[in-house]
């Protein structure tokens, strides 16, 4: 579901959000963004 990547992919403070984006793409979303260290799919 939409928030399935929040727990799986924690976001680092700086830099590489590739893990979040990859998780979101695998879940069928366009991309992943980080908000307060949490991965959100859009």
Swiss-Prot record:
Gene3D superfamilies: Knottin, scorpion toxin-like. Keywords: Disulfide bond, Ion channel impairing toxin, Knottin, Neurotoxin, Potassium channel impairing toxin, Secreted, Toxin, Voltage-gated potassium channel impairing toxin. It comes from the Eukaryota. GO terms for molecular function: potassium channel inhibitor activity; toxin activity. GO terms for cellular component: extracellular region. Disulfide bonds join 5-23, 11-34, 20-39, 24-41. Expressed by the venom gland. It is found in: Secreted. Belongs to the ergtoxin family. Gamma-KTx 3 subfamily. The presence of a 'disulfide through disulfide knot' structurally defines this protein as a knottin. Blocks Kv11/ERG potassium channels. This is Potassium channel toxin gamma-KTx 3.4. It comes from Centruroides gracilis.
